[in-house]
Amino acid sequence: MIDGEAYFEKNSTGKLGSWGWRDVNLQFIICTLPVPIYFVVVAIWTINGASNSYRFPFLQTYMILTDRFWLFFRCFTIVAWCGWCSNYIFFPCLMNAILYIISLSLSRDTTFILFIFYQMNKLITVIRDFSYSVYNWCYETVIGENTRKYKMTWKVPKESLKIIVNKNADARMQRELENRTAKDEANALTSRRRVFGSYALIGTQRAEFIQFRQIKHIDITNASLDFLYNLKQLKHDNLANFYGIQLNDDLNTMTILHALVERGTLEEFCLDRDFGMDETFKSAFMRDILKGLQYLHLSPVAYHGHLHAATCLIDINWVLKIALYGVTNFVCDNFDAENITMPDRSDYTISYAQYVCFPPEHIREYDATGKLPTRFVRGSKQGDIYCVGMIFYMMIEREDPYRLIHSVERPGSGLMMEILDHNLMPFISNNETQEDTLLDKCKECWNRDPEKRPTIENLRNAIAICYADSKGNLIDQMIRMNEKYADELETLVAARSADLALAQMQTMRLLNEMLPASIAKDLKNGVIAPARSYASATVMFVQICDFIVILKRRPPKEVIGFLNDIFDQFDTVIKRHDAYKVETTGETYMVASGVPNENEGRHVFEVAEMSLEIRAISLSYTLENDKNYKLRVRIGFHAGPIAAGVIGIKNPRYCLFGDTVNFASRMQSNCPPLQIQTSEITARMLLATHEYKLVKRGIVHVKGKGEVNCYWLNEHIHKDEEIEESGTISHPLES
C-alpha cells in the first residue's frame, strides 16, 4: 500500500537532481551513459595520434581517457542525489584518481597531456549537455507522470471543504412547485431550479456530494491511485466535473464531490407531466448521454457504474451532464473491506426505483430480507448499456420502468426478486409508434448476456432512425421546431393559431435568455449574425456599494433575495429604453445602448435617462429586514466605438469588445457612491442638448488612461417636477 502524499512529501520531485530512491537505477544509467562512448572515441583518437610520435605507458594512456573533474563532479552529484547509493561509484572514481596521479608521474611530455586534456573537456561538455537533455526528457515522460499521480490531486483536503445545510429546503421546494403551477410553460422552463438540502463549497466552487461514514483508515493501492488520477483528468461537455474525494482525516467521513448542476435531473423532467418532453428534448438528451458515455468508455476509467436518470443532470443551458461516474467500484471495495458505512442520516440513499434499474449481474448481492439497499453496485461497460436502456425507456414512456407492471407507487423488494429470479423486464406495449425501433434497442440492452447487448454506435443509429427530423444541439432543434410549427400551423384554422403563438413564444424566450432579440431572430431565420464594429455606442456599469457589508450581515438566502429584487427593478428600467443588459457579475450590472440596434445617436441619452432612474430607485430603496440600510450605487458610462458579436456555437453569447468598455468600467470604479460619472466627450454630447445638468468634477487619474477630465450627471432639467412628485430624496451632488 502506498500513501501517495507521504511519498511525495518525502521525495519532492523537480528537475535534475530530485528523484527518490525508486528512480536511482534509471538515473545512474542515464548519467553514466556518455562515459563508454567517451572512452571509445578518445581512445581511438589518442592511440592513433600517439602511435606516430609518442609511446605512452599504459597508465599514461588510461589517464588521458579520464577526466578527473568531470568524474568527480558526477560522483559527488550522484552522492547528493542517491545518498546511500554513492558506494556504487565512489570506489571506481577513487581508483581512477589514483591511476591518474601515477600516470602523470610516469609521463614524459606533460604539454601533450594538457592539450589532450583540454580537447577531452570540450568533448565532455557536449556529451554532458546531451546527457542532461536525455535525463530531463526521461523525467518528464517517464517519472513526471508517476509523480503527478503521487500528488493525489483528486484528494480534497478538509480545510478546503465546507458543507452548507439548507434548513429551508422543504419550504423552497413547496414554493418552487407553486411557482411552476402558477406560471405558463415557457416561464416554468426558464425559471426551474433544483432545491438542495445541502451542498458543499470547495473554495469558491459549489459541489454536490455523497458522504459516507469512515470507520478506519483507507489504504490507497497503486491501482486505485492510477484510477483516481485518471478520473480527475476527465473533461467533457457532457460530464459533470469530478472534484475529488475527501477521506483519511479527523472528520471520519469519506465524501465524493462533483460539480453542482442547477436546473434539474432527467428523472424529474421525465416524471413531470407538466413538462412537454417532445422528440426535440428526447433526442438531444439521448445524444448527450451517449456522447458522455462514449467518452467514459474510451477513457482509462472505462465505465460509469451508477448510471440512472437521477444522475443525468440538466444544466442552465439545457445541456445534459452525467454525474457520479467511475466511483462505484472504489466505494464497493471500501464497503467490502468495512472501511466505510452509510451514515445514520444521509441526503443520498439508493431507492428501489433506482436499484431495479441496475443490471442484474451487479445486483445479485442484494439482501433478500427486503431491507432498503444502502450500498452501491459495481459497474462495467456492459452494465452501463443496460442502464442506458432503462433511461431511454423512462424518457419514452414518461414513467418508472416497472411502474406499468406493478400498481405500487414505487418499486419494492418483491419486484427485485422477480427481476433476479424470473428475468422480468419493463412492459412494452404493442402499439406501433415511431419510437418502436428505439424500444427494440432498449430490449436488447436488457439482454441477460452482457456480451450480446448493443454498442453505443448501435444506439446512436437507432436514435437517428427514430428521430430523423431532430438533429444538432437543443438550440438548433428549437429553431427548426419553431419553423416546422410555423409551416404547419399557418395552414390550419384560426383555432390553432394560439398553439403557434405559444410555440414561438417558448422558443424565443429560451433564446432571449442568452441573446439580444434581434440576434435571436436572425438565428431563428437561419442567418448567422456576423461580428461587426459600431462607430458609436454607450456602455454603462452600475455597482452596488458596500455589498460586502450585506454579505457579512445577512445569510445567503437574504443576499440572493436582495440581488434578485434590486436587479429586477433595474431590468424594469432597461425595458423602458432602447438598451440591452449585457450581464450581471456579482454586484455589478452592465448595460449597453446602440448595439446591436443602432439608434441614430440616441444611445447616450438613453443611458443617461437609465442612470438617473436607477439612482432614483436606489435612493428610495429600503431593505425589508433592515429599514436603516441605505442602498448606494455608483454609476459610470462612456460613449465611443465598440465591436460586438456572438461568441460560441453550443452556448452562444453576445459579447462587447473595445476600449469603450474599459473606459466605462473605469468611470464606474473611480466614481464616489450615489454619483453618475462620465467622460468629457460624453458630457459634451449631453450638454449640447441643454437638457441635462452636469457638474465638472475635474481631473481624475484613471488607470490605463492617465489624467482624465470627468463630469457628474445630476439631473434631467425637464423632469424636476416629476422627481419631486415621486418623493425621491434629493442628494447634494454639487458640493
Curated annotation (Swiss-Prot):
UniProt function note: Guanylate cyclase involved in the production of the second messenger cGMP. May be involved in sensitivity to quinine by regulating egl-4 activity through the production of cGMP. Promotes the calcium flux to the cytoplasm in ASJ sensory neurons upon removal of a nitric oxide (NO) stimulus and is thereby involved in the behavioral avoidance response to NO-producing organisms like P.aeruginosa.
Membrane topology: Single-pass type I membrane protein
UniProt domain comment: The protein kinase domain is predicted to be catalytically inactive.
Cellular compartments annotated: Cell membrane
Residue spans crossing the bilayer: 28-48
Pfam families reported for this sequence: Guanylate_cyc (PF00211), PK_Tyr_Ser-Thr (PF07714)
Alphabetized UniProt keyword annotations: Cell membrane, cGMP biosynthesis, Glycoprotein, GTP-binding, Lyase, Membrane, Nucleotide-binding, Signal, Transmembrane, Transmembrane helix
EC identifiers of the protein: 4.6.1.2
Carbohydrate attachment residues: N11
Protein name, as recorded: Receptor-type guanylate cyclase gcy-27
UniProt main location, coarse: membrane
GO MF: ATP binding; GTP binding; guanylate cyclase activity; peptide receptor activity; protein kinase activity
Gene Ontology biological process terms from the UniProt entry: cGMP biosynthetic process; chemosensory behavior; intracellular signal transduction; receptor guanylyl cyclase signaling pathway; sensory perception of bitter taste
Domain Protein kinase positions: 188-465
Tissues in which the UniProt entry reports expression: Expressed bilaterally in ASK, ASI and ASJ sensory neurons.
Protein family according to the UniProt entry: Belongs to the adenylyl cyclase class-4/guanylyl cyclase family.
GO cellular component: plasma membrane
Domain Guanylate cyclase: 538-668
Catalytic reaction list: GTP = 3',5'-cyclic GMP + diphosphate
